[in-house]
Amino acid sequence: EDLQGDAVPEEXATKDDNEHPQTLLLTNVEFNXRPFVLIIYDRNTKSPLFVG
């Protein structure tokens, strides 16, 4: 089976951070059967905009 499609280049995260200066991106990635967690905090309100 070809699982290459599941790989995500690390450059993508840095690129997104640079393109969205208004938000602080905190990521926790575990590839041992654990889910991908992405939390975006608004710098002004200090509240989560998105958790997924």
Swiss-Prot record:
GO terms for biological process: acute-phase response. This is Alpha-1-antiproteinase 3. GO terms for cellular component: extracellular region. N-glycosylated; contains glycans with bi- and triantennary side chains. It comes from Equus caballus. Keywords: Acute phase, Glycoprotein, Protease inhibitor, Secreted, Serine protease inhibitor. Coiled coil: none annotated. Belongs to the serpin family. The record marks T23, L24 as: Reactive bond. The reactive center loop (RCL) extends out from the body of the protein and directs binding to the target protease. The protease cleaves the serpin at the reactive site within the RCL, establishing a covalent linkage between the serpin reactive site and the active site of the protease. The resulting inactive serpin-protease complex is highly stable.
